[in-house]
From Swiss-Prot:
Belongs to the eukaryotic ribosomal protein eS24 family. One of its GO terms (biological process) is translation. Gene3D superfamilies: 3.30.70.3370. It comes from Pyrobaculum aerophilum (strain ATCC 51768 / DSM 7523 / JCM 9630 / CIP 104966 / NBRC 100827 / IM2). This is Small ribosomal subunit protein eS24. The keyword Translocase does not apply.
Length: 121
């Protein structure tokens, strides 16, 4: 059983990017830093939205305090998030699907490099 408790410290509305930017505090005395997945699940449950619209940008733990602060972006639509969020953030938050996106991007990058090399010759 996990002894974590979460609290939303700050909410900022970013209408230009169609998202809410949250600062979430996680208190986890005598336990490890909470996972991205657990933070995503808690935020989605609290706001009553789909977990696919929630992306954890960073979790910063204060040394020796048993407290972490997480930066979370909550989008109105997951399609907007896939355009705006960097690929590495998508990969960290989406698990297997994110790894596939990362592999596809690497493949495209390598194809462009090969094409550029052939063009130089």
């Amino acid at each position: 059983m996990s002894a974590e408790s979460f609290n939303i410290v700050h909410i900022r509305e970013n209408k230009l990017l169609a998202r809410r930017e949250l600062l979430v505090e996680a208190v986890h005395q005598n336990a490890s830093t909470p996972t991205r997945q657990s933070v995503r699940e808690w935020v989605a449950k609290q706001l009553g939205i789909d977990i696919s619209n929630v992306f954890v940008r960073r979790i910063k733990t204060e040394f020796g305090r048993g407290r972490s602060l997480a930066e979370v972006h909550v989008y109105n639509d997951s399609k907007i998030a896939r355009v705006i969020e960097p690929l590495y953030i998508l990969a960290r938050n989406l698990g297997e699907e994110g790894k596939k996106l990362l592999e596809e991007a690497k493949k495209r990058r390598n194809e462009r490099r090969e094409k550029k090399k052939r063009k130089k010759k």
